[in-house]
């Protein structure tokens, strides 16, 4: 390995320039002999003094932005000026401009950027109003500009938040309000309590504002706003604050809620935004900004944190309870029995209610502390505010990262590429129950493919920034993961989790729509290589190819003909290990041989498998399973051998937990009774698979469904969404009617988008049948009638459950397991 000595200022400058231009991180490997030795890319750098790791290269400009300013907790934009706020409470005005990029020099004020990417010219403005006028004009020629001035500043100048800080350092005020109504515009609306938990410099301060101590709630809110300005927190957090708390306070304050730094008011956006939950569901809200502070809505934070969609509800109290964060002895309040509007004048009740509310801020702060670290540390690299990190999708964050990597050096930036559909990964299962199943997977398959096969867009990304950053994040994550395991220090685990988010999102970013640096062709290439790797692995194990065949043809021979495909095993067998394939799923496959292997045997098998692949494509031991039940493609049940279990994979009795894979098995909306039925049937299938016993179990639930005593066991969970609130289909209308009935009966006091509700299927008399929108009649003119099925809240249960519906649901649930139930 070539050595390079730093022995004067010029040699120091040369190596610093190399590090900056190539976006590499120098690694100190030795300084025991008085010589500082660093590994930089593929050569060794030596110096008699610590010349490399100084402020100039402390933060890799590709990863953290070129500006090394530390302890930034917020950036504000006001009156054509930018303000930078630091953790010590200081602030300064910093230079910055607004800008529009174009593909041509549309007038002499457009200046040429470096490089050959699409947006080659930049027009900069000192006036925000002039910029807005120019932006409106730029739509005619397809110009590009940042979404907001603050992100624009960060993209152009390389600022990022929280450099040199840890997640617990910024000051945080968690708050919650109690009100008399659900809508601040209704008669009798009033904010009666504001609970606060402030953490600043490691010290917790709690304060409760009570409307009874003021002449009106407006005067209380003004006093609270004054207190917020005095305490000067960098972060405001609360649960569902965008849609409820801040909106309510804003209205009740006369739309002049001055809680920002430099005496600035809260500002709501004119147009709605959407917080995405998953590919099919999002929540509409109006974004709010507070000058010099970040607003973190812990409901949105929970949505981003709950990747596995395990929360039964996104309400604050249910999440706190589910996560085991509830304060011991915490007072609970029954709002139905004692609504806020009726207890304010009852001194004893009010005293109890105050005690209940005093800890409300603690709950939001507990969620913040648990969930924020990964986003906090990722924010040190991504040129967005912390608030934007929570409210936006990962693809947008990576895109900003990539734009910054070029624009901060006045380099032209890319134009988005139209996304196209492409073939995905291989998934197939051979139904049946298997014993002693080996499972192998490729660690970080898609990122590994990107690096191994050099997958990046040579035209859009000429300096290879995407792959360089991916390599750096991968290497740093491995170091932090190892440090976390060796030391048990949470900081390292938080860092590696942040890095994991970006690493695992790179592939999805390439295939996304509307992003400057997307690369759909590259995403297709990655999945193609992924399929090749899986096919090669399966052939090594079984000697058989997996081939794609037509599963179904719709409208055959017509213009709108549509074919669906499936993967199956070819009959041809070649020399191999002679194993039997069980399942294939994206980055893994499982197989069986004779008996349970020893750990040494399995290790040798994996070594043999890895010997036929490139170094970065590494197959790993994903466990040996005592039982695996494959139902269909992407739906299977796993029970590990105890010897292969980590402590967290054992239940309270020390037995291996059962893992369910697939939508049919993990449906979170399934009724509790049917979830229970599925669990007991799975247990029986894995422990005997006795057909008579299984039939007896099914009959037990059929009997319960015909005579329901506890309707809560038969309720389905639904999320109250905009589509449900505004929809005109039967399900949406049934939900709207159920909500209206519950509000009128005061079963619920309010409902808002994102709330989880539980409903059961009921019968309310009869209604005339319809077909294609028309009422149906018998030949003699009599109307054809059917049951009038509706949805109801369980609190309104009147022994009116729909027996036929629930018997059908039992049948559907049992049929999920039909392929593996013993039929002998």
Set out the residue ranges of the language-model regions.
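Common nucleic-acid-contacting/processivity interface regions adjacent to the catalytic cores
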Residues: 1-22, 28, 337-444, 448-453, ...
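Short active-site loop/helix that positions an aromatic residue
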Residues: 245-254, 443-457
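DnaQ-like (DEDDh/DEDDy) 3′-5′ exonuclease domain used for proofreading
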Residues: 1-232, 257, 358-359, 363-382, ...
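Short beta-strand
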Residues: 580-585, 621
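Active-site-proximal helix-loop-helix substrate-binding element of RNase H-like nuclease domains
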Residues: 206, 211, 232, 236, ...
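Short glycine-rich phosphate-binding loop at a beta-alpha junction
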Residues: 234-241, 551, 582-583, 590-592
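C-terminal, non-catalytic extensions of nucleic-acid polymerases
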Residues: 12-28, 560, 602-824
């Amino acid at each position: 390995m070539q050595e390079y000595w730093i022995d004067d200022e010029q040699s120091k400058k040369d190596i610093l320039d190399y590090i900056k231009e190539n976006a590499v991180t120098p690694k100190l490997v030795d300084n025991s002999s008085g010589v500082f030795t660093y590994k930089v890319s593929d050569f060794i750098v030596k110096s008699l003094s610590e010349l490399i790791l100084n402020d100039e290269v402390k933060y890799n400009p590709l990863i953290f932005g070129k500006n090394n300013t530390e302890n930034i907790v917020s950036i504000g934009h006001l009156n054509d000026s930018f303000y930078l706020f630091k953790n010590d409470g200081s602030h300064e005005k910093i230079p910055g401009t607004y800008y529009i990029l174009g593909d041509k020099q549309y007038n002499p004020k457009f200046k040429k950027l470096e490089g050959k990417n699409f947006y080659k010219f930049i027009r900069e403005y000192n006036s925000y109003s002039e910029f807005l006028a120019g932006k409106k004009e730029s739509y005619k020629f397809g110009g590009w500009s940042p979404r907001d001035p603050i992100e624009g500043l960060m993209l152009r100048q390389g600022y990022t938040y929280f450099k040199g800080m840890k997640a617990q350092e910024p000051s945080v005020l968690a708050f919650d309000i109690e009100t008399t109504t659900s809508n601040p515009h209704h008669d009798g609306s009033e904010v009666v309590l504001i609970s606060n938990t402030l953490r600043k410099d490691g010290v917790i301060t709690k304060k409760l504002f009570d409307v009874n101590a003021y002449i009106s709630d407006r005067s209380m809110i003004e006093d609270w706003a004054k207190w917020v300005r005095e305490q000067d927190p960098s972060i405001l957090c609360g649960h569902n604050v965008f849609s409820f708390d801040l909106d309510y306070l804003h209205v009740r304050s006369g739309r002049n809620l001055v809680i920002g730094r430099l005496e600035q008011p809260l500002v709501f956006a004119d147009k709605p935004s959407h917080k995405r939950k998953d590919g099919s569901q999002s929540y509409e809200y109006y974004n709010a900004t507070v000058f010099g502070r970040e607003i973190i809505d812990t409901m949105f934070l929970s949505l981003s944190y709950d990747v596995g969609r395990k929360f039964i509800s996104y309400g604050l109290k249910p999440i706190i309870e589910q996560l085991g964060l509830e304060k011991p002895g915490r007072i609970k309040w029954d709002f139905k029995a004692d609504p806020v509007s009726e207890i304010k004048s009852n001194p004893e009740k009010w005293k109890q209610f105050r005690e209940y509310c005093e800890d409300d801020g603690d709950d939001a702060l507990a969620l913040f502390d648990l969930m924020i670290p990964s986003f906090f540390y990722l924010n040190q690299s991504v040129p967005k505010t912390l608030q934007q990190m929570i409210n936006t999708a990962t693809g947008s964050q990576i895109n900003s990262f990539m734009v910054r990597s070029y624009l901060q050096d006045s380099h032209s930036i890319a134009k988005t590429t139209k996304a196209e559909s492409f073939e995905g990964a291989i998934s197939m299962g051979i139904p049946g129950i298997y014993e002693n199943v080996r499972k192998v997977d490729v660690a970080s398959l898609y990122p590994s493919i990107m690096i191994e096969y050099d997958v990046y867009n040579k035209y859009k990304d000429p300096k290879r920034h995407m792959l360089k950053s991916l390599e750096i994040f991968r290497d740093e994550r491995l170091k932090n993961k190892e440090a976390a395991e060796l030391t048990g220090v949470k900081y390292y685990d938080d860092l590696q989790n942040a890095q994991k988010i970006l690493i695992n999102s790179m592939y999805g970013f390439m295939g996304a729509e509307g992003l400057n640096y997307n690369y759909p062709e590259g995403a297709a290439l990655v999945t193609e290589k992924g399929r090749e790797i899986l096919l090669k692995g399966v052939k090594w194990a079984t000697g058989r190819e997996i081939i794609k065949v037509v599963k179904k043809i719709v409208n055959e021979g017509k213009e709108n003909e549509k074919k669906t495909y499936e993967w199956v095993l070819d009959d041809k067998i070649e020399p191999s290990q002679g194993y039997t394939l069980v399942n294939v799923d994206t980055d893994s496959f499982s197989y069986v041989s004779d008996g349970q292997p020893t750990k040494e045997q399995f290790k040798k098998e994996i070594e043999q498998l890895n010997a036929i692949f490139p170094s970065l494509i590494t197959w790993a031991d994903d466990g040996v399973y005592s039982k695996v039940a494959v139902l269909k493609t992407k739906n299977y049940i796993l029970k590990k051998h105890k010897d292969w279990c980590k402590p967290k994979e054992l239940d309270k009795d020390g037995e291996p937990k059962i893992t369910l894979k697939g939508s049919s098995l993990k449906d979170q909306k399934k009724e509790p009774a049917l979830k229970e039925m599925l669990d007991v049937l799975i247990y029986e299938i894995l422990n005997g698979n006795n057909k008579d016993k299984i039939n007896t179990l099914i009959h037990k639930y059929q009997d319960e469904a015909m005579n329901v005593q506890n309707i809560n066991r038969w309720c389905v969970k639904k999320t109250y969404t905009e589509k449900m609130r505004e929809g005109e289909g039967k399900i949406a209308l049934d939900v709207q009617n159920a909500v209206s009935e519950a509000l009128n009966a005061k079963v619920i006091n309010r409902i808002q988008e994102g709330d989880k509700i539980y409903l059961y299927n009921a019968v309310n008399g009869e209604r005339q049948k319809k077909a294609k929108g028309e009422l149906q009649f018998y030949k003699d003119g009599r109307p054809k009638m059917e049951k009038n099925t509706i949805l109801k809240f369980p609190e309104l249960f009147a022994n009116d459950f729909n027996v036929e519906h629930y018997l059908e649901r039992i049948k559907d649930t049992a049929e999920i397991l039909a392929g593996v139930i013993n039929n002998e």
